[in-house]
Amino acid sequence: MRSSMSLGAAVVWLVVGAAAPDAAQYQVTETADEIRIVTPQLEAAVRKKGYVSGVAAQSMLDKKTGFRDPGFGLDIVDWIMEPGSDEAYRDQLHPELVYHAGNLYHGQRQKRSIEGPQICTQARQLDPKVIRGADFVAVTQQFQYRTAAPGRKTGSVWKQVLVFPVGRRYFVSMDKIETVNSSDAMFLRIDMPGHLRHQRGDTFSRIWLSYRGEIPASEFFSDFPPDARFDYLRGRDPLPERFIRAYQLRDPKTGKEGPWLAGMTLEPSVVSDAWCHQRGYVCFIEEFGGRPIKAGDSFSAAFIVGYFDSIDEMNQVFDQHRGHTRLEVSPQGWRLGK
């Protein structure tokens, strides 16, 4: 399929890690419920059943510091959506597809589901596959959407690639939609890097958004809607040089500060809307796409998610991989593409 978001007529590939260290020391175990990956830098799990997609909640261990992700998972996937209200046909929708605006959860911007269900909570079961290479381990998984709004087809396919490179405290990922529907502004909703659970800032000290700057934990002690503050909206806000969303972790028992847990969208222009608001937890919903697309086309975004010691380190890693929206993997290697 051709991409409706290509940045040029030709695809430009970046081949990664040709002379990287060996990944033979990676431990990969698989059960009926999950795939677990252990490297010298990280531990992480990918769930097959229950709450699925991305890296499982609190499974990603940074061995350098001993910290884990404090949320519901990393690079977690929801619905295919578009701007607009579903009010005219809401009584015909499966309840899981109904979208109510004008509240603390969704704010004032009208949006509606094209296809569902929400993958993370309703897919129930996926069949992830492991790919091992000389300098990485990867997991691929996909899901075919099975519900749709009136007048829309079911059957679009979500695909995800997660690559764990040798010697890194992060993974590289891609989410891709191969659509059976047309839309003026179709987007995929994900959690990036992932939601942040806390009690009055006990698990984090501050948030850093590359398009907003640093925000203290105290700003998230009370609930507020996503469009009240700290949100990003393409077209309203300047396009940032980098698109990075991160929080500095804190040990809830000792108060000791830990590493930054960051999610980077490697091509900033693909992001149409991004939230950072409090709703019992800090909600890091991100939406990418939001451009015209025809049935039979596809769109994707590429990410880096993991642990970093400083904002400078995050910026350096972003700059090494900037501009990419695709990720391909085989036993021979993995590569980011534009």
Regions found by a protein language model. Give the residues of each.
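Bacterial N-terminal signal peptides that target proteins for export
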Residues: 1-9
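Bacterial N-terminal signal peptides
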Residues: 8-17
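Acidic, contiguous internal or C-terminal segments within carbohydrate-active enzymes
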Residues: 29, 48, 128-200
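Beta-strand-rich recognition/accessory modules
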Residues: 26-38, 228-338
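Boundary at the C-terminal end of the N-terminal hydrophobic targeting segment
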Residues: 18-24
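Acidic-aromatic substrate-binding/catalytic surfaces of carbohydrate-active enzymes
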Residues: 32-146
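Polysaccharide-binding surfaces and accessory modules of carbohydrate-active proteins
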Residues: 181-256
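Broad, structure-driven detector of short, well-ordered beta-strand segments within folded domains
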Residues: 41-48, 156-164, 258-265
